[in-house]
A protein has these predicted regions:
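A short acidic-Thr-Gly-centered motif at the start of a beta-strand
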Residues: 48-53, 212
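C-terminal active-site "lid" helix and adjoining low-complexity regulatory extension at the edge
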Residues: 166-204, 211-238
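Short, surface-exposed charged micro-motifs
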Residues: 143, 208-210
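Short, flexible loop/turn elements at secondary-structure junctions
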Residues: 21, 64, 75, 130, ...
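Short secondary-structure junctions
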Residues: 10-12, 54-56, 198-203
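Phosphate-binding site of ATP-dependent enzymes
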Residues: 53-166
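Conserved N-proximal alpha/beta basic substrate-recognition cap immediately N-terminal to
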Residues: 1-48, 66
Length: 238
């Protein structure tokens, strides 16, 4: 949340932060950065926020974790009441929520609301779910590896679902296969370099980029301390 707010305050396009539930034990700077958006603790508050904001789909991301653990995508049709929750989390009788490392879709209302209550009860942030660009029936986003002021690597991550993390056996694709216009690649590069420049002591980062469906306008989803390119070697040509 703090990183996302820093990027947004600098005028860089991001997937918007909608709400949060930051535990008191988090560092004060993280709480301060998240104070500009509402706090929600349960499914009822989430539905109220979505209806008030006229938003039908959101991402729920835990404050702690990696490899898509706990990351969930929620879609709600206000008029019909139909719901769908995409998540790797599953209820466990002893442990509460467990990470299955496999994306599942839940559509039963009672099950969805129960899972949402548990997910939102943990430290998390909520972001707007933007429709991603598509390639041959897959939605995709980009993972950029930026080091020492240059873009070293750019990889597409393809998925049939809303979550593209490669840890979920999604499909990596070389950026050249997308045949993106040079102007789009230039815009992605410029955005990544501007983001890294906001952190003078940071020499490398893995930056997740969403390309909006239709316009291909880039938005930063998040920044990571490592490139995390599974099965890829950015130095393979050395």
């Amino acid at each position: 949340g703090a990183c996302k707010e820093t990027l947004a305050h600098a005028g860089l396009p991001v997937t918007e932060l909608l709400a949060k539930n930051i535990p008191d034990r988090m560092p004060k700077f993280a709480q301060d950065k998240a104070a500009v958006c509402p706090t929600i603790h349960n499914a009822a508050q989430l539905l109220e926020l979505m209806q008030r904001s006229n938003i039908s789909q959101v991402f729920i991301k835990p404050v702690h974790g990696s490899g898509a653990a706990g990351v969930s995508a929620f879609r709600w049709q206000h008029r019909s009441g139909k719901m769908a929750l995409y998540t790797c989390a599953m209820e466990h009788p002893q442990m509460g929520l467990a990470n299955t490392k496999r994306l599942r879709r839940f559509s039963d209302t009672d099950t969805v609301l129960r899972l949402l209550d548990q997910l939102l009860g943990m430290g998390c942030i909520l972001e707007r779910w933007h429709a991603k660009a598509q390639y041959q029936g897959y939605s995709y986003d980009l993972r950029a590896v930026v080091q020492d002021g240059r873009l070293d690597y750019l990889l597409a991550r393809l998925s049939k679902g809303p979550i593209t993390n490669l840890q979920l056996n999604n499909r990596p694709l070389d950026i050249d296969a997308l045949e993106l216009p040079a102007s789009v690649v230039d815009a992605v590069t410029d955005l990544c370099l501007k983001a890294l420049a906001l952190y003078p002591g940071l020499t490398s980062a893995g930056i997740d980029i969403l390309l909006e469906q239709g316009s291909l306008r880039p938005r930063i989803i998040e920044m990571n301390g490592q490139g995390d390119l599974i099965y890829q070697d950015i130095y393979r040509q050395n």
